[in-house]
């Protein structure tokens, strides 16, 4: 069992880095689970859960735990015992449930200046139906201007969407810092600058390689 959480605000690059890690460690049985992808899939399919989730996301708010937790934990467990997590748990209620059912080994906090985050978000191209986002500098689409999965056109965020993104950054600061403080007290959290995805990937991959070479992965990082 080895579970890694990539934690960072919108625009921090956690999704890009998480996918890089999964590609690197896929031969060792690692899978990728992103709470955002799970939610966007339900929104795209118009499920009851997706409709309810969309109403909160449109306001720049997180989906309440009463709606989210049961569904997302079941999907997370399906990803298997070796998984790179993107964006979950985000608050203490979610953390408690995860630690009871699927405890984490390593948490990576990505620190990026607010000005850089806003700049990245303003440059993102978005697939409206799914919410998938691309950055031309660090995570470009395979074909210019088109979504990797559907081939449909990508669009820049509108002014209204950028304002929602700014509110999401404020929500992140209020909630996720408590989760990170919990893991820091357990010495399971490492903090890194998220301004270079490649540098973060290489550093985290090295930590994972060291742990996976041992019979029992370390559970604390000094």
Curated annotation (Swiss-Prot):
Q: What class of enzyme is it?
A: transferase
Q: What Enzyme Commission number does this protein have?
A: 2.7.4.3
The record's Gene Ontology cellular component field reads: cytoplasm; mitochondrial matrix
Q: List the subcellular locations.
A: Cytoplasm
Biological process terms from the Gene Ontology for this record are: AMP metabolic process; nucleoside triphosphate biosynthetic process
Residues bound to ATP are 11-16
Q: Where is this region: LID?
A: 123-160
- Name the chemical reaction catalysed here: AMP + ATP = 2 ADP
Residue numbers spanned by region NMP? 34-63
- Has UniProt tagged this entry with the keyword Transferase? yes
Q: Would I find DNA damage among this entry's keywords?
A: no
**Which Gene3D superfamilies does UniProt cross-reference here?**
P-loop containing nucleotide triphosphate hydrolases
Provide the binding site for AMP: 40, 61-63, 87-90, 94, 157, 168
Q: Which keywords, in A-to-Z order, does the entry hold?
A: ATP-binding, Cytoplasm, Kinase, Nucleotide-binding, Transferase
Q: Which domain of life is it from?
A: Eukaryota
GO molecular function per UniProt = adenylate kinase activity; ATP binding; nucleoside triphosphate adenylate kinase activity
**Subunit structure, as described in the record:** Monomer.
Q: Which family does it belong to?
A: Belongs to the adenylate kinase family.
Q: Which HAMAP family match?
A: Adenylate_kinase_Adk
Primary role = Catalyzes the reversible transfer of the terminal phosphate group between ATP and AMP. Plays an important role in cellular energy homeostasis and in adenine nucleotide metabolism.
> Entry's PANTHER family?
NUCLEOTIDE KINASE (PTHR23359)
Protein's recorded name: Probable adenylate kinase isoenzyme ZK673.2
* Source species: Caenorhabditis elegans
């Amino acid at each position: 069992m080895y579970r890694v959480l990539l934690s960072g605000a919108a625009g921090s690059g956690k999704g890009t880095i998480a996918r890089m890690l999964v590609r690197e460690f896929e031969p060792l049985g690692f899978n990728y689970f992103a709470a955002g992808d799970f939610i966007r899939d339900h929104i795209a399919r118009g499920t009851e859960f997706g409709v309810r989730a969309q109403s909160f996301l449109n306001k720049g708010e997180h989906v309440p735990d009463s709606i989210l937790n049961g569904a997302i934990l079941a999907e997370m467990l399906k990803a298997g015992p070796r998984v790179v997590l993107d964006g979950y748990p985000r608050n203490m209620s979610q953390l408690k449930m995860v630690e009871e059912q699927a405890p984490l080994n390593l948490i990576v906090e990505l620190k990026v200046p607010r000005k850089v985050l806003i700049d990245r978000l303003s440059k993102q191209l978005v697939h409206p139906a799914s919410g998938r986002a691309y950055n031309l500098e660090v995570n470009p689409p395979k074909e210019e201007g088109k979504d990797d999965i559907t081939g449909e056109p990508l669009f820049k965020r509108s002014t209204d969407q950028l304002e929602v993104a700014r509110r999401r950054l404020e929500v992140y600061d209020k909630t996720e810092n408590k989760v990170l403080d919990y893991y820091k007290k357990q010495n399971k959290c490492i903090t890194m600058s998220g301004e270079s995805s490649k540098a973060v990937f290489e550093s985290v991959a090295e930590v994972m390689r060291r742990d996976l070479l041992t019979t029992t992965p370390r559970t604390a990082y000094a």
